[in-house]
Amino acid sequence: MTKGSQKKDCNSESVIIRYDTKRYDFLSWASHSLGTRELHQLHQQFNYPSLEMVNHLMNLLKNQFEEINGLLYTFINKEIASVLGPIASYQNPPSFRVHFHGTGFTPFHRDRDWHGKIDMNIVRRFRNIWIPLTKVWGNNSLLIE
């Protein structure tokens, strides 16, 4: 993005932000935190991943978050803000998700449907940022609303 260019209006569109994965090496951090060399092969370490196992893995990431807190701060304030504009606040620590092939622990949904009686004018100001740590394609991804 060049100086003077307009920031993306993400209220009605999805945006893919490309970034330097070597500089922001979230993959190595997650692999180390979960005790695996190849994160995309994590599913091979378990016979059948239960909800308890998935929760355990997400807690491992949350417990190790301080190791990358500064890196995530820089990522948000440089990479994300360069596209969306200044970031007033963000969830810290973020929500970590671990998904295994063939397992789904929540029904198909849209986030906006889960907000119930919350003022939707406030909710619209929030943005979900998804940072996949393994390759994604087709139905190995998220539906972007």
Positions of PLM-derived features:
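N-terminal start-of-chain detector that recognizes signal peptides
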Residues: 65-70, 94-103, 111-117
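A structural signal for short, well-ordered beta-strand segments and their strand-loop junctions
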Residues: 16-19, 88-97, 128-132, 141-144
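N-terminal auxiliary "cap/dimerization" subdomain that precedes the catalytic jelly-roll/cupin core
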Residues: 1-85
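Short N-terminal edge-element motif at the start of the domain
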Residues: 80-108, 122-123
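Catalytic core of non-heme Fe(II) oxygenases with the double-stranded beta-helix
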Residues: 106-145
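Generic structural motif
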Residues: 22-24, 101, 134-136
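Functionally constrained cores in energy, signaling, and assembly domains
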Residues: 21-23, 79, 97, 110, ...
